[in-house]
Amino acid sequence: MSEVLHINDADFESVVVNSDIPILLDFWAPWCGPCKMIAPVLDELAPEFAGKVKIVKMNVDDNQATPAQFGVRSIPTLLLIKNGQVVATQVGALPKTQLANFINQHI
């Protein structure tokens, strides 16, 4: 997959939990300034990490169950998930280089 995938609460298990590669899950909202800043960064990273990490986004305004399950209180919150388990969390936007380093450290 070379582009960011938008998911919802109903898709979570099939897309994230059952994934055979790590997932970078971005919890975001359309009104969130830092979320808007990180969106193009995620779009750039998706093809660079194709086959190694799947980048997915979930709108917290439209989906409350999954963010609540993970205790998301601030956005953007990025979770790196491997084999259905959270292995790293990043709250807040990062520049592309730092976000790529965050991913590489945990995959």
From Swiss-Prot:
Q: Does the keyword Electron transport apply?
A: yes
Superkingdom of origin organism: Bacteria
UniProt-recorded Gene Ontology molecular function terms: protein-disulfide reductase activity
InterPro entries per the UniProt record, alphabetical: Thioredoxin, Thioredoxin-like_sf, Thioredoxin_CS, Thioredoxin_domain
Looking at the UniProt record for this protein, which Gene Ontology cellular component terms does it annotate, in alphabetical order? cytoplasm; cytosol
User: What are the cysteine partners in each disulfide bond?
Assistant: C32-C35
Annotated keywords = Disulfide bond, Electron transport, Redox-active center, Transport
Cell wall biogenesis/degradation listed as a keyword: no
What are the GO BP annotations of this UniProt entry?
cell redox homeostasis
Give residue ranges for domain Thioredoxin.
Answer: 2-107
Can you tell me which family this protein belongs to? Belongs to the thioredoxin family.
The family database entries (NCBIfam families) matched by this protein are listed as:
thioredoxin (TIGR01068)
Recorded hits in PANTHER family, A to Z, give: GEO12009P1
Report the protein's function.
Participates in various redox reactions through the reversible oxidation of its active center dithiol to a disulfide and catalyzes dithiol-disulfide exchange reactions.
For this entry, the protein name equals Thioredoxin
Name the species this protein comes from.
Answer: Haemophilus influenzae (strain ATCC 51907 / DSM 11121 / KW20 / Rd)
Lineage of the species this protein comes from:
Bacteria, Pseudomonadati, Pseudomonadota, Gammaproteobacteria, Pasteurellales
